[in-house]
Amino acid sequence: MVAAVRVIGGETPLARYVLKVLRDRTTGFPEFRRYVRIAGSILAVYIAGELGWVEEEVETPLGAKAKELAPAGPVYLVGILGASLPMVEGFASMMPEARIALVAARRVEEPGRLKIEVYYSRLPRMFDGPAVVLDPMLATGKTVAEAVRLARDRGASKVVIGSIIASRQGVEYISSLYGDTPIYTLALDPELDENYFIVPGLGDAGDRALGVEP
């Protein structure tokens, strides 16, 4: 099964404008961080359709009744540290009730291959609802795949992936493992370079969003 990929940049000019700002090498980190946050909010609008909702009746200030929607239960945002921090914030601004979990991983490069080592996670013992894995750059897909595995192993009722830019290679890797996991991204770029950066991409999202180069 091939994962369903929805490229939001093809659906709204606002996403393309956000991408323009983020891709521009002259964008400074305060503005970059701000637009990563906006990208998270845009993703929330689209990913919301994947989550469970129930109809609830409320009374308006005029004493009239109206039926609208509310989350069917807890929703978890699983952020990949650290560039995802403003992205998670943007998503949570649209769904303030969302619970936030974190996963941190490092690359371990070996001759001929790349491995991912998770060195920190703050996850519920068991998920009692859907999980949205958020990572600005879905490059090789290995870190995101590990976060998906952790969420599924802990009982997430559904897992959805949100990114700002995804590579075709990363999407194919996710599909090979979790073909039933939908992927939402503002852009789908064609390739990775020798350092596993997405091309054309936007550079190192972590350095640019946090303003600190390790």
UniProtKB/Swiss-Prot annotation:
Binds 1 Mg(2+) ion per subunit. The magnesium is bound as Mg-PRPP. It holds the Pfam family UPRTase. It catalyses: UMP + diphosphate = 5-phospho-alpha-D-ribose 1-diphosphate + uracil. CDD domains: PRTases_typeI. 5-phospho-alpha-D-ribose 1-diphosphate binds at residues 107, 135-143, 204. Keywords: Allosteric enzyme, Glycosyltransferase, GTP-binding, Magnesium, Nucleotide-binding, Transferase. Uracil binds at residues 198, 203-205. Pathway: Pyrimidine metabolism; UMP biosynthesis via salvage pathway; UMP from uracil: step 1/1. The keyword Disulfide bond does not apply. Belongs to the UPRTase family. This is Uracil phosphoribosyltransferase. It comes from Aeropyrum pernix (strain ATCC 700893 / DSM 11879 / JCM 9820 / NBRC 100138 / K1).
